[in-house]
């Protein structure tokens, strides 16, 4: 049986240790700012593409006018730092679009994200429906400034880096 009684010498030692301590002022510590959510509603007005038109090995590049070529070069080289990513393997088209919409909305304070769509190796005709839909969706999204296939060691043609218009 464990003795739960505290003897006087232990009490005295404890008191002598904490006696000179002052309680923390509740307002003096730094408060963390909660994650700023986008004031813009998630993009929901997109169309679906039900026929694949892009092969799994095709390199993708798309950018809006006015984007600096340096930014696109950095994206193609993977020199954009750590990026949040979403993996769409196993998703149906509708689920994937909704998930990408939510993902972009949640990460609207980031400049870059990564979307892993796969290469469509299990497709009947060698065309990737998921990759085609992701490209179709990103071209419609108003907050997407550019996207391109990732470097080979970061997903290659089975993933894209996306440059977002930040609202922060």
Predicted regions, residues:
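Long, charged, low-complexity intrinsically disordered regions
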Residues: 1-112, 116-168
């Amino acid at each position: 049986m464990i003795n739960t009684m505290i003897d006087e010498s232990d009490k005295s030692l404890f008191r002598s240790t904490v006696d000179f301590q002052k309680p923390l002022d509740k307002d003096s510590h730094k408060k963390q700012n909660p994650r700023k959510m986008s004031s813009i509603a998630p993009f929901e007005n997109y169309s679906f593409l039900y026929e694949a038109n892009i092969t799994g090995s095709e390199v993708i590049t798309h950018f809006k006018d006015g984007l600096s070529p340096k930014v696109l070069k950095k994206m193609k080289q993977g020199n954009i730092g750590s990026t949040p990513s979403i993996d769409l393997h196993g998703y149906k088209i509708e689920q994937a679009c909704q998930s990408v919409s939510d993902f972009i909305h949640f990460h609207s304070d980031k400049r870059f994200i990564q979307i892993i769509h796969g290469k469509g190796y299990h497709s009947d005709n060698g065309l990737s429906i998921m990759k085609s839909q992701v490209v179709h969706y990103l071209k419609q999204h108003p907050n997407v400034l550019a996207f391109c296939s990732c470097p080979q060691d970061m997903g290659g043609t089975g993933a894209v880096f996306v440059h977002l218009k930040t609202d922060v």
